[in-house]
Amino acid sequence: MPERELWPAGTGSEPVTRVGSCDSMMSSTSTRSGSSDSSYDFLSTEEKECLLFLEETIGSLDTEADSGLSTDESEPATTPRGFRALPITQPTPRGGPEETITQQGRTPRTVTESSSSHPPEPQGLGLRSGSYSLPRNIHIARSQNFRKSTTQASSHNPGEPGRLAPEPEKEQVSQSSQPRQAPASPQEAALDLDVVLIPPPEAFRDTQPEQCREASLPEGPGQQGHTPQLHTPSSSQEREQTPSEAMSQKAKETVSTRYTQPQPPPAGLPQNARAEDAPLSSGEDPNSRLAPLTTPKPRKLPPNIVLKSSRSSFHSDPQHWLSRHTEAAPGDSGLISCSLQEQRKARKEALEKLGLPQDQDEPGLHLSKPTSSIRPKETRAQHLSPAPGLAQPAAPAQASAAIPAAGKALAQAPAPAPGPAQGPLPMKSPAPGNVAASKSMPISIPKAPRANSALTPPKPESGLTLQESNTPGLRQMNFKSNTLERSGVGLSSYLSTEKDASPKTSTSLGKGSFLDKISPSVLRNSRPRPASLGTGKDFAGIQVGKLADLEQEQSSKRLSYQGQSRDKLPRPPCVSVKISPKGVPNEHRREALKKLGLLKE
C-alpha cells in the first residue's frame, strides 16, 4: 500500500502519515481555515473519475436495496457508509476552522471498503497534536470527536449530491481546545434537520443495533466512546477483508448514530433514511420493531396428511386416535372430522354398490367387541364434554366406529330390538356431537318398527340396514347384488338358506348366521361379474346338481343347444362367447378346469 505524508496548512499542525487503503490511489488533503464549497477542486482527474464510478455503483446498489434484491448482510451495512463517505469540505457547526476532507483514491471495491471505512478513522492522534489533520488508523482515543466530525460531514453533504464515495475517508479532528463541545452541537444541529427524513418500510429497518444506538445517542461525550471502541480494527485493510456480519452490524450502529443527514444524495435517499430511522425514533421501544421481522415460520402439515396416516390406526385403536386429535388445533380437527365423514360416506356408498355389508373387511373387530367399542366412547365423551370444540370432531368418528358394532348387536336380536336400541342411546347422549354429526344414528336406532321405511330412502344407511334386518327390502338388495355373481352356483340355495336363516337371527346364534351372510358377499367381491352377462332371471332355474351334471356330460353339442334353448338365441355351438355355464363349449371349460386343478376325473 502506498503511503503519503500529509502536511496540513494550519498553525501548530504536525504532519501525520496516513496509509492509503486502495491499491493504486493516494489520498490528498487540503486543509483551509475558510469555509469553501469547491470540495473537489484539488482532486486529480483520475480521482474524479473514480468518484463518478463509485457514485454510479452505489446508486445501483441503492436501487437494488430498494427493490429488496441485495443480500441482508452486505447491503444494509454498506449503504450507510456510502453516505458517510461523502464529507469533503465540512464547515464545523461551531464556526471554528474549517476541516477539509478528501476521499481516498477510488477503486471499484465499493462494498467492502465502505463497510470498512468508518470505524477506523479515530481522532486520537490529531486531538493530541492539537491539529485538525488526518490521523492514522489507530485505536479510537476519543470517539466524541469522531462523532462530531462525521456529523459535520453529514451537514455538508447536500452540497455534493453526486459524490457517493464509500471509501475510508480522512476526517479531520478539530483543535484540542474544543473536544468536549464537539459532540453536542453537531448532534443538535443535525437533529433539527431530522424531520426531513423519510422512514423506510418496517421490513427494511435494522432491528438489532437499535438498542445500542438509542443508548449511545442521548448520552454525554464521556459515554459516547463506547460504541466506536467496539469496532477498532488495527487497520482499514483488515476491516475491508473481513466484512463479517458482526462488524457490519456494529458499523451500522455507529454510522446511524452519528449520521443524521437531512438531504442525502437523491440516489441514496431511501438507504440513508433507513440508516437514520433508528436515531429518529430513539424514544420508541426497540422491541416494537422486532415483531414484523419474524417472517419465516416452519410450515405445518396440512390436516389431510394427518388424516391419511391415522385412518388405519383409528379403527384398531380409537383411544390413540382421539389422543392424537385432541392435540390438534380446533380448526384443523374440524377439517379432519369433515373429511373423515366424507371418506366414510364414500366408503359406504362404494360398499353398497358392490353389494357388501359395511365394514365387512373387519368383522372380527366389531363382532368381538360390540359393546366395548361403545363404552370407551361414553367415557371419552364425558371427558371431552368440557371442551365441546374438541368433542365435535372426535365424536363423529367414534360414533361412526361404534355404529357398525351397535348395528351388529341389533342384527343379532331384531325381535327385542327396542331394548338394545335404547341401550346405546343413553350412552351416546353425553356427547352432543355424536347424534348431531353422525347422521346414521337416528335411523339405525329404531330398527324394528321402521325397518321397511328406513331401508330404501337414505342411501348412506342402506349398507348398515343390510346387516341389521331381514325384511323384503333386504332380500331385494341382496337379489340385486346377486346379479354380480359370475355363475349361478348356489344362488337359489343361497336365497333359500337366507330364508331359513331369518328365524335364526333372533337367537344367540346370530353371529354365526351373520358370518354365513357375509361369505357370499366375499365371493362376489373377489369375483366381479360383467354387467352384460344378464340379470338374475337367467340364473333362477339353475340348480347345483344340474350344473354338476352338465359339467360331466360328454356331448358339448347337447349342452350348447340346451343353453341356446334356455337363452332363446339360435347360435351355432362354438360361436358363443358368453362367460357363463350356458354358452361355453364344454371342452374348453374342462381344459381350463383341469389346468386349474379343479376338475377331477
Curated annotation (Swiss-Prot):
Offer one Pfam family short name for this entry: SARG
Q: In which tissues is it expressed?
A: Highly expressed in prostate.
| Record-given protein name | Specifically androgen-regulated gene protein
According to the UniProt entry, which residue ranges have a biased composition of type Low complexity? 20-39, 174-190, 384-414
Locations of Polar residues compositional bias? 100-118, 142-157, 224-236, 307-316, 464-485
Q: Specify residue ranges for compositional bias: Pro residues.
A: 415-429
Q: What does this protein do?
A: Putative androgen-specific receptor.
Disordered, as annotated region:
1-41, 56-538, 551-601
